[in-house]
């Protein structure tokens, strides 16, 4: 079976694990029948860490791509996003409408032709 690589990413204040499970289960419901699902995570808190939890609960392979802040400084998150998009087939982003990092992930995934699902949520004020 071929792999289907999906990024689960989003804002760092995202904490609604039930919503993440519902969205991801729906998005992957057909692919899981014909592919090995691989969850790709940037390793940040919030949506990324919930995506890792989801992968473990569902028995999916997990690939972690943590940003190398020491090496790349402020550009590390953007470099990580590009690295993840280069190996992914799709991207599910949980976005508060403000996070620049999540917006960058959405933009780069879209530019690279990935199937992108954006889940807007209110965020924490």
Where are these regions (language model features)?
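Acidic/glycine-enriched connector segments
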Residues: 2-3, 14-125
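Active-site beta-loop-alpha junctions enriched in small/polar residues
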Residues: 11
